[in-house]
């Protein structure tokens, strides 16, 4: 464990460049059916369509339904969250038929401790010390959520917390690293099943990476100042357990980590998560987190915030429109590389491929 801590210090903030379109994960010609499919699709996509895939939005005052449907038809939306009924999800997915490349949406929701059937809060589930019971609750949640047309759950929440003042204590599994790590893997496997493309499986988006439950003073979104030994020994293992269990997605936390917000933390999202831990999935910002880089004092404006997030390794931007607004301008100005956009787009398309949505966008909606 100490070797990991030292390695974390030495790596710094550098990471390998993202892959160019048309290459496999090793930088060589695509070797698998999945890589070939994605490379072929990306070769036909415009940059506007690639950036559209990075947009995760919900229907609401900021994104009225009719306007959002028009954006879907124009290829400007990658996924939807907080739409939870079959008729509404189907109506949104239907708009994809009118887009140029017909890239399906995925639909996500906070399925935390049940969907239609409500189980005890996560802290209560953890108090059972019964992994089988927790697995059954997550499997039932997956069955019910997928039956409503959902593809992804923003769950499990595996943030270790040892400060009862924090307002989200009830959403996690508590203070014990071993127990939280155990239940983290249990829930991921129960949600995703043996075949993520199955109609009754949903993708797990483990959250909040990282250290969200260690916010100073128990104040949500606050700073975290923590040594690497404590980080690796006490707080990071539950996220690692989710990655090892095959979690398809990771939601990035809103807090800072030793002065750098997680949403702009290249060491966290690229060097640790992808290079050391071998995570191959999708990274998603928390709600409005890219814009909040300004409030954290790291970014001077929306343009800077967008650049910092995409270069750190955040694939999808949740609900604000910073990526769609600023990525084209940053690319034109040479402030980001084409590889940054291609990497993020590839991760989104890979998640949709794994969910079976290219084979059948309606697989969780019935006929």
Predicted regions and their residues:
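Bacterial N-terminal signal peptides
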Residues: 5-16
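Glycoside hydrolase catalytic-domain context in secreted enzymes
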Residues: 19-367
């Amino acid at each position: 464990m100490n070797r990991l801590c030292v390695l974390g210090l030495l790596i710094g903030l550098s990471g390998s460049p993202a892959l160019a379109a048309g290459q496999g994960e090793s930088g060589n010609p695509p070797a698998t059916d999945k890589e070939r499919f994605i490379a072929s699709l990306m070769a036909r996509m415009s940059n506007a369509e690639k950036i559209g895939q990075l947009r995760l939005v919900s229907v609401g005052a900021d994104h009225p339904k009719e306007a959002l449907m028009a954006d879907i038809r124009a290829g400007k939306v990658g996924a939807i969250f907080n739409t939870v009924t079959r008729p509404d999800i189907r109506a949104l997915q239907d708009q994809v038929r009118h887009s140029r490349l017909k890239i399906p949406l995925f639909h996500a929701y906070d399925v935390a401790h049940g969907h239609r059937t409500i189980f005890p809060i996560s802290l209560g589930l953890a108090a059972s010390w019964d992994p089988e019971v927790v697995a059954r609750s997550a499997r039932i949640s997956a069955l019910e959520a997928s039956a409503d047309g959902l593809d992804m759950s923003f769950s499990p929440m595996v943030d270790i917390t040892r400060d009862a003042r924090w307002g989200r204590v009830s959403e996690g599994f508590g203070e014990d690293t071993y127990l939280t790590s155990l239940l983290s893997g249990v829930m991921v496997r129960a949600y995703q099943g043996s075949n993520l493309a199955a109609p009754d499986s949903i993708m797990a988006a483990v959250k909040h990476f990282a250290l969200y439950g260690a916010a100073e003073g128990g104040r949500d979104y606050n700073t975290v100042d923590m040594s690497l030994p404590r980080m690796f020994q006490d707080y990071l293992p539950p996220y690692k357990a989710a990655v090892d269990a095959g979690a398809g997605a990771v939601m990035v936390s809103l807090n800072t980590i030793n002065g750098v917000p997680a949403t702009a933390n290249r060491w966290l999202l690229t060097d640790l998560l992808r290079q050391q831990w071998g995570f191959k999935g999708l990274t998603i910002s928390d709600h409005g987190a890219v814009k909040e880089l300004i409030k954290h004092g790291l970014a001077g404006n929306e343009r800077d915030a967008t650049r910092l997030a995409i270069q750190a390794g955040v694939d999808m931007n949740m609900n604000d429109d910073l990526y769609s607004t600023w990525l084209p301008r940053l690319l034109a100005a040479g402030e980001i590389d084409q590889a940054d956009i291609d990497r993020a787009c590839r991760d989104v398309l890979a998640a949709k491929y794994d969910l079976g949505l290219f084979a059948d966008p309606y697989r969780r909606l019935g006929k």
